[in-house]
Amino acid sequence: MGRQAEFWSESKNNSKIDSQPKAKSRFASKRPNGTINTHPQERMRAANQQEE
């Protein structure tokens, strides 16, 4: 392994997640009434129901 690859591998393995996450609730997608889509699987299941 070359020196560049060794340096990259060391820096990758020694990295720590000390900071706060960048995602913020104020950027979450909301509906016009202020609710958030928290159950997308239920919505997809309901959309795929075939009416007879």
Curated annotation (Swiss-Prot):
Pfam family of the protein (one): SspK
Organism (species): Bacillus mycoides (strain KBAB4) (Bacillus weihenstephanensis)
Keyword Cell cycle among UniProt keywords: no
Induction statement: Expressed only in the forespore compartment of sporulating cells.
Name of the molecule in the record: Small, acid-soluble spore protein K
GO terms, biological process: asexual sporulation; sporulation resulting in formation of a cellular spore
InterPro entries given in the database record: SASP_SspK
Location of this chain's protein in the cell: Spore core
Similarity-based family: Belongs to the SspK family.
Keywords tagged on the record: Sporulation
Cellular component annotations (GO), alphabetically ordered: endospore-forming forespore
Primary site of residence: other
Start and end residues of each stretch annotated as Disordered: 1-52
Domain of life: Bacteria
Keyword Nucleotidyltransferase: no
Gene that encodes the chain: sspK
